[in-house]
Amino acid sequence: KHERRKQIDKLCKIHCIFLPVVVCFYTQSQQALLLPKRRTEMSKKKKSGKKTALKVIGIILAVVVVFVGVYAALMAWTPAATTYSGEINPYITADAALVSAHRSGGGIMPENTMLAFESCMNSKDFNTDIFEFDLHITKDNKLILLHDDTLDRTTNAVEYFGYEDVKPIDHTYAELRELNFGENFQAEDGSYPYRGLRGDKIPDDLRAVLLEDVLDKLESHGKYSYIIEIKDGGENGMRGVDILYDVLKERGLLDRVIFGTFKGEVTEYVDEKHPDMLRSAGVSEVLKFYGAALLNLNLDEDSFKYDALQIPANQYRVVRLGTKKIVDYAHRYNIAVQYWTINDPDEIERLNDIGADAIISDTPDIAYKIIKE
């Protein structure tokens, strides 16, 4: 029995290696087949290019066939996963999925601005259960809300500072407060209602938002849960985690925040320095979970260091995470499943029906109507 378990674990690891390879080959082959036609002087290379594309497709099919064969064989004798017997994860919902405002509801108002938070908080048409937002550290060690690595897309930073790729780490919080964070927000009618606002004409709720300020604002209004992602990696990311931890602990919010990051070194730092923080699975952990779920492996209750999967429903048409099998397997191990970024009404309804615990959407108003009503 022990040897059988070891063999299963090895095959699971092999699958987790093959899966990214399949995705990579598939993506590259799609790009190769969709490339524009070469000019006349490149015509001699067309035939060899087609042959290469066919070879790539052949490799993909071969890998898939091998995986399917292994999977089918294992499913015949792999033991079923056990059921978690400890304290129930509060983020696992018994009925409908929770509604999470992605980037504070960036499809309704300018993302990650106080105006967006206020729009969700004060709405009489829908309620928000979870606020999702992203953080970057500034030059003076403040945490501000921003999704991208630079301020170029959402603000007038390029115009104001005179160069491109403006990053928060290169400027103080006071300097970033001079920017218009609603500059490039496009309303549903196609207009840009906040474009061109400068200086004193920029309202306070369209300026850079400090972590402490948004938490205090929300907590004064009601009791919410939060999904907070640190975007920085390396030392900046670790320093950002320390600041975030202190802010949350001071306000008694550690149990209402699920922390996330795409940086492996930051995940390891959280596990080592702040093990009492709730967190979502990292990229490699999601791949391992996916392999274990497909094989229905029987794992120990303490096999997972994370409390939630924050994942897309489908990735590259190959990795299908938005299935009832994935949700049920996660729930067996007391792991909540929260899907991003889901804006399509039909997909919202489908994921809610399979038991998703949260729908993270740019349009929480639409998600609420579908899920709650």
Please place each PLM-identified region on the residue numbering:
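Extreme N-terminal basic, low-complexity initiation segments
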Residues: 1-12
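Leucine-biased recognition of intrinsically disordered, low-complexity hydrophobic segments
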Residues: 11, 19, 33-35
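Phosphate-group recognition and catalysis centered on beta-loop-alpha active-site segments
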Residues: 43-373
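N-terminal Lys/Arg-rich, disordered targeting/topogenic segments
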Residues: 23-52
